[in-house]
Amino acid sequence: MTKQPPIAKADLQKTQGNRAPAAVKNSDVISFINQPSMKEQLAAALPRHMTAERMIRIATTEIRKVPALGNCDTMSFVSAIVQCSQLGLEPGSALGHAYLLPFGNKNEKSGKKNVQLIIGYRGMIDLARRSGQIASLSARVVREGDEFSFEFGLDEKLIHRPGENEDAPVTHVYAVARLKDGGTQFEVMTRKQIELVRSLSKAGNNGPWVTHWEEMAKKTAIRRLFKYLPVSIEIQRAVSMDEKEPLTIDPADSSVLTGEYSVIDNSEE
């Protein structure tokens, strides 16, 4: 059986009995995800505030915007959509929650490319805020010419006064979280550290790392800050999978995840 994503292991549940979706023999992903059986699976995975119809419309739009997605392994695409559903994140650049990218390696079963799910900057903030214990969360880039200093220890502090040159090269990226109990946590990364993370990402040379570098750098700092934040183990595991390996769903396995969580309406900085 194909390995399930971390969250799916915890809440694995059958939604179609012994009936499995038919194997896909062509690249018509749009037709496949509009099948009633797929709508049932997505409906079981989605939180209350989202519908299967909306997620399918979003997925269809992404395929039309990035035609290469339609030529990827269908089960890999479906698996990425299901994980977006599990996390309550909408793929696409409109909200910046998550991105779907064709992944260079070939799927060993179909011979096609896999689909890579990448959590975006705003998606990372949304996941963190769901704990209900975070008052604010933000990330900033530091440029040459900015006044910037930070200290660790018993009296930790961070000072950043931006300069006037908004086009100056980035030197650091940092993320700051203020907790509702009054505590503050921050994480600072150098550009060299950010580039090292990018080099280890399977999507480091395309997609948002190329088109939205600063947002991906901010997301990377927030992701590293997660280890200090009061977020659930399930969310931490999902975040740890970000950009690391493509997900797959076996067509013969009709298992999907169901989960409950509350969504906090947040207006991003």
Curated annotation (Swiss-Prot):
The organism sits in which domain of life? Bacteria
Which cellular component, as a GO term, is one annotated location? protein-DNA complex
Assembly and partners?
A: Homotetramer.
Question: Would the keyword DNA-binding turn up in this protein's UniProt record?
Answer: yes
**So what does this one do?**
Binds to single-stranded DNA and also promotes the renaturation of complementary single-stranded DNA. Function in recombination. Has a function similar to that of lambda RedB.
Q: What is this protein called?
A: Protein RecT
Q: Which GO terms describe its biological process?
A: DNA recombination
Going by the UniProt record, its keywords in alphabetical order are: DNA recombination, DNA-binding
An example molecular function term from Gene Ontology annotations:
DNA binding
| Entries under InterPro entries matching the protein | RecT_fam, ssDNA_annealing_RecT
